[in-house]
Amino acid sequence: GDSEVPGMWFGPRL
């Protein structure tokens, strides 16, 4: 998820 990896926006949350 994005919350786990700040900087990557491939997660379900932008």
From Swiss-Prot:
Q: Where in the cell is it found?
A: Secreted
Q: Does the keyword Secreted apply?
A: yes
Q: In which tissues is it expressed?
A: Expressed in the brain, subesophageal ganglion and in the retrocerebral complex (mainly corpora allata).
Where it mainly occurs, coarsely classed, is: secreted
Gene Ontology MF annotations: neuropeptide hormone activity
List modified residues, type Leucine amide. Answer: 14
Alphabetically sorted, this entry's keywords are:
Amidation, Neuropeptide, Secreted
User: Which is a GO BP term held by this UniProt record?
Assistant: neuropeptide signaling pathway
- What PROSITE patterns does the annotation carry? PYROKININ (PS00539)
What InterPro entries has UniProt attached to this entry?
Answer: Pyrokinin_CS
GO annotation, cellular component aspect: extracellular region
According to its UniProt record, which protein family does this protein belong to?
Answer: Belongs to the pyrokinin family.
Report the function annotation for this chain.
Myoactive.
- State the name under which the record lists this protein: Pyrokinin-6
